[in-house]
Swiss-Prot record:
This is Ribosomal RNA small subunit methyltransferase B. Its EC number is 2.1.1.176. S-adenosyl-L-methionine binds at residues 254-260, 277, 303, 322. It is found in: Cytoplasm. The active site is at residue 375. It comes from Cronobacter sakazakii (strain ATCC BAA-894). The keyword Amino-acid biosynthesis does not apply. Disulfide bonds: none annotated.
Length: 429
């Protein structure tokens, strides 16, 4: 039964939901993957991620190949053609198979009358591919980012913006975090090799291992037993800087899906940890991660702007605030971000971050540490945010992360093999 489902039509429908309806791929894709065989799940993911990674190129090509855009209920055909173009450009699928399966996608979504159109457009691309790609190489769309975001990168990083964009357009590496409560990193690497896989360590983060070739978690030694967790190297930097200690009371704010909560408990198993997130659906992932790693934390649904509603007057020794942000540092992992975000979102997010910082600061004990982190590369959410906070908060000071003028540490995507991340470590006087 599962074999008869046309993957190209599923991919086209998923991409349409993202681009036209503003749904995130992480919401749209899993239900569709349940419809297909395990063997086909990876290809469905590749088609969806790949089209969203290269969307501006595929859009440009369709505009060149078609005299009129598909509108209304026929938009799914537009995205089906994109799926076909992506296969011809970026996969090893034989062209005849890519064409045949994409054309059959029209049958799967009951648009048989468009089979000839899809076939004609894709064959026209094959004939004109070299000249079309030569012309495309001079277009702004070649950067595969919306112009508003490209402009922000160029303003924020006049020397590095091109490297940032190129890193965003790459496939992400698969980083793991070894649970030091079970094995040292070197011990687990030996187990990995015994299972026919290889990886290498990160020079800065002591628990991080990068797989030389991505693998399903079911193949990782001890994954179900909690020996290892999938987490990018840059995200692991949060707990390294937070430096949690046994016996402390620690708050992980904006905690879902729980990767940093469990990392805190791996580093300080005798700490008392509260994990809070505003999203009741995503908080279930925190419970899942705690259960797999056999850990306990006080998990709550709560808004970071109103901490008294979920922690009363409690003060914490350490607070990790992984603030809601534009996620512009993790585009290589979530290419839909490029098309879901809007320029106006940035100021709105900066305002939200500011409100959370001001609200949570009174809940940090004197002498305590707050680590502010984002997976953004935009100064408005990062260094400018912290500079403004320091200027209005007399009892806050930086602790070894940057200077007063440019507070914090900014990792750009790919620069340390990890995602784009920002950290600022603050001490309450």
């Amino acid at each position: 039964m599962k074999k008869s489902i046309n993957l190209r039509s599923l991919a086209a429908q998923a991409i349409e939901q993202v681009v036209e309806k503003g749904q995130s791929l992480s919401t749209v894709l899993p239900p569709l993957q349940h419809k297909v065989s395990d063997k086909d799940k990876a290809l469905l993911q590749e088609l969806c991620f790949g089209v969203l990674r290269t969307l501006s190129q595929l859009e440009w090509l369709i505009n060149k190949l078609m005299s009129r855009p598909m509108t209304g209920k026929q938009r799914t055909i537009h995205y089906l053609i994109m799926v076909g173009l992506y296969q011809l450009l970026y996969t090893r699928i034989p062209p005849h198979a890519a064409l045949a399966e994409t054309v059959e996608g029209a049958v799967a979504i009951k648009r048989m009358q468009f089979k000839g159109l899809i076939n004609g457009v894709l064959r026209q691309f094959q004939r004109q591919q070299d000249e079309l790609l030569a012309e495309f190489s001079g277009q702004d769309a070649r950067w595969l980012h919306p112009m508003w975001l490209l402009n922000r990168f160029q303003t924020a990083w006049p020397r590095e913006w091109q490297a940032v964009v190129e890193a965003n357009n790459e496939r992400p590496p698969m980083w793991l975090r070894v649970n030091r409560q079970h094995h040292s990193r070197d011990e687990w690497l030996k187990l990995l090799e015994e299972n026919g896989m290889t990886g290498h360590i990160h020079p800065r983060y002591p628990d991080a291992v990068r797989l030389d070739a991505p693998a399903p978690v079911s193949a990782l030694p001890g994954f179900e037993q909690g020996w290892v967790t999938v987490q990018d190297a840059s995200a692991q930097g949060c707990v390294e800087l937070l430096a949690p200690q046994n016996g402390e009371t620690i708050l992980d704010l904006c905690a879902a899906p729980g990767g940093k909560t469990t990392h805190i408990l791996e580093a300080a198993p005798q700490a008392s940890v509260m994990a809070v997130d505003v999203d009741a659906q995503r908080i279930s992932r925190v419970y899942e991660n705690l259960k797999r790693l056999k850990m306990k934390a006080d998990v709550k649904v709560g808004d970071g702007r109103f901490p008294s509603t979920w922690c009363g007057e409690t003060q914490f020794d350490r607070i990790l605030l992984d603030a809601p942000c534009s996620a512009t540092g993790v585009i290589r992992r979530h290419p839909d971000i490029k098309w879901l975000r809007r320029d106006s979102d940035i100021n709105e997010l900066a305002q939200l971050q500011s409100e959370i910082l001001d609200a949570i600061w009174p809940h940090l004990k004197p002498g305590g540490t707050l680590l502010y982190a984002t997976c953004s590369v935009l100064p408005e959410e990062n260094s400018e945010q912290i500079r403004a906070f320091l200027s209005r908060t007399p009892d806050a000071q930086l602790d070894g992360t940057g200077s007063t003028q440019t507070p914090g540490i900014q990792n750009l995507p790919g620069a340390t093999e990890g995602d784009g991340f920002f950290y600022a470590k603050l001490i309450k006087k």
